[in-house]
Amino acid sequence: MKATLLLKAQLSPVSYTTKKSFQRQLNRTPYTAFQYFFQLEVQKLHNVSKYEDIINHVRGNSNFKRFARNEWDSMSLTKKRLYYASFCQSMDIDILNVSKIELAKRLEIPIPAMSEYLLFRNKFKVKFDSHCSSLERKDRKSVPRPSITRKVATTEICSKSRSNTPVGKINPRKRLVALKRISRSENTAKNHSHEAQNYLYDYMKRFQQMCKECRYAWNEEVDYDQKLEIRKKLQVWRAKFEEMMDNEIQILQKNMDIMSKFGLRSESYLTAANHDTNTQPNNILPMTYLLKKK
């Protein structure tokens, strides 16, 4: 047999904006408590179903993950705190030394904005997206099928100057970037990937436009008194966050001590038979902590 130096390879359609996001993708351990909960839900499927059925059900199935997310969001706080303790114990998270911001991210607890401008931008983005969605709904009602004329007209609207489009105190201006719809009639993987990339490009372009509009509104339309009021709200939010995290850490430490006292921590791991299992986020599934029956 003669060896060949030909290497068959192709570019991946997946793109990463930062080095940290790429490294996080390589790390398959669950980063948040919900990802840990999702692992346990997939593990239940491994216990009661065939491997082939699990692959077909989980791989590329957003409905299953949406179902798990609804279960997680509707879960009581007491039960969710038990998952918090199980997650931190399984991932060896030092809750006393890790920063409160990092711990809140791992537990998916809302954290305060880093600055007054970011707090303003969060509110601005909500209204910006709402206004953009309303324009899209009006466009769908007026024109059933997107045409070149409509796209040109939308582009002309987006290219108006600042003097023709007045800015409100917080409300986003009407100079928006149109989004390109993905056609559902194209079923091939190549066309779908191309349309998805175009949609992602348009979304990033709209986000950049939102940041530009928000910066203009912050510098030109928000006066000193309004900025001072935003600063006071942020200070109150940070104080409540510190108090809430102190309480959560105490409860978390108590639950972890109880689990360790009764020997509820398991070092057993269930490994998927196929490394291509797309369980997202991990194909090494830790055993759950089983509560002893009274």
UniProtKB/Swiss-Prot annotation:
- Record carries keyword Ribonucleoprotein: no
Q: Which keywords fit this entry according to its UniProt record?
A: Mitochondrion, Repeat, Transit peptide
Annotated organelle transit peptide span: 1-90
UniProt feature coiled coil, ranges: none
Transmembrane domains' residue ranges: none
Phenotype on disruption: Leads to increased mitochondrial DNA copy number.
**What name has this protein been given in UniProt?**
Mitochondrial HMG-box protein CIM1
Source organism (scientific name): Saccharomyces cerevisiae (strain ATCC 204508 / S288c) (Baker's yeast)
